Amino acid sequence: MKLIVITTPQFFEGEAEAVTSLFQNGLVMPHLRKPGASAEEMGNFLQQLPMEYMPRIVTHEQFQLASVFGLKGIHLNGRNPQIPSGYKGHVSRSCHSLEEVLKHKSDCNYVFLSPIYDSISKEGYSSAYSCDTLQKAQQAGIIDSKVMALGGITLEHLPEIAALGFGGAVLLGDVWQQAKEAFIPHFLHLKQL
């Protein structure tokens, strides 16, 4: 099962070092999500990361940076719903309903489905799906290896996410809300499952 980590919405001091540390400890593919950040701000952040990791990063904003920095790809969402003209690389997308998954899954490398559980990082962002609904979606072939679970994912949820047939889990609050000394040990524990 894939583990994807999304950055926090705002830049923070030491973030480049934290993301680099995640890479060094086995993070395969982070998603750079900075709503409202300028291309310059995002470019400055990317320049703080070792160049060897650029081909593993997916950006949610400022899609032109994908070619400038040789990033893995782009992630479509409500703010940026269209693939740029001429773009041929990796594409993922946020989906907030099973209908959206059906509509977009075949056009993407994978999609995020959310919120699976009550969000850790977004107050009032509650689970949208019952376990029964998710099981039926799996049986119908809607949830499969191209669908990543997002929203309130914690260590305790990973076995259920796997049993429901998701291809992976997308983490945000559970990773970034860890104390500095627990940050990497927690990520390594998540990776073991």
Name these PLM-found stretches.
Residues 16-17, 42-43, 180-184:
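Conserved strand-to-helix beginnings and helix N-cap segments that scaffold or border functional pockets
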Residues 5, 76-85, 112-125, 155-193:
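Glycine-rich phosphate-binding active-site loops on the catalytic face of alpha/beta enzymes
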Residues 18, 57-72, 76, 96-107, ...:
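Catalytic cores of alpha/beta
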Residues 1-16, 92-94, 147-149:
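Active-site mouth loops of central-metabolism enzymes
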Residues 21-23, 27-87:
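N-terminal active-site wall of soluble small-molecule enzyme domains
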Residues 13, 37-40, 177-178:
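Acidic-and-aromatic substrate-binding clefts and catalytic sites of carbohydrate-active enzymes
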Residues 6-10, 35, 62, 79, ...:
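Active-site beta-loop-alpha junctions enriched in small/polar residues
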